[in-house]
Amino acid sequence: MKTIINIFIFCLILFVYLHIQYHLKTSNDLEIYEIEEPSKQKFEEICDIRQPTIFQLNNENLVNETNITNILNKYYAFDMKIRNINDIHKKEEETYMSLPLHTLNKLLTDDNSASYFSENNSDFLKETGVAKIFKYNDEFFRPHMVSNCYYDILRGSDKCHTPFRYEINHRNFFMPTQGTMKIKLAPPKSIKYLFPNYDYENFEFSSPINPWNVQPQYLSEFDKVKCLEFDLNVGCTLFIPPYWWYSIIFSENSSLSIMKYRTYMNNLTISPYIFMYALQVQNIRRKSNNVKNIAIESKNVENVENVENNEAQNNKNENENVENNENNIEPYQ
């Protein structure tokens, strides 16, 4: 009996070990595949190669229902999150700020500095019911034994870019729903030249380097990184494997629908990341970006109240002076 238990434990450990090694496997070949309308079986086989792939898949329901024009027309009063690309490594402040969609849209349209983009909008998708649209139309993309599905809508001001970062989910799909955007990819082995920053609070693993306009202090290291750069249009879906670095630069009025998936074994593989995330969210508090604005607004309100009080006091004094003058006037005889 003891022998049987030992064999069972050995088989269980071997099973877990092989699956973890499978999920940690990466490909560093600097090439991208293009596949037109594959079958589900072919689709799974290609994704398992862990190579970036553009699939010519036209999911009209997702494109029509989740493009930013349709979202803006239907849900303009709901809040979406916005982020400043220049503040990605300022740890003392909140990373995201919520704004009503119509206000956010105006900010992105008027942003001439290419600084703002919107992401991490899962709360918005749940409140508006758009998450159900993703759920009803993403069956083809879901891997076997899926445990977690994450959906998002990503957009930015003209020429704004996302941080240079990588994902640890088992599958990551990026589907343009409006406009055109440029993508830059780098293989996992590039990490030693990219000065990675592990932000467990936002569960983001990024580089301080801007791959579209490299800062002088990082130029010597980034010259060793080989990148793929290409355009992505509506009607295509990009698969980015885990641990591949990517950055997206937006064109005017463009938007992306994003679908990310984890499996049970994927969660086990990334459990150290998840554990660090759980610790981080309990131990860190950040200042809100709204604090400064609220303080300014409060100060303005106080100034207005002081002006109104001064005006009221002046009017009162004038009335008293008029009454005194009237009392001092002698009656006409």
Enumerate the language-model features and the residues they cover.
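N-terminal accessory scaffold of Fe(II)-dependent oxygenases
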Residues: 1-237, 245-311, 316-333
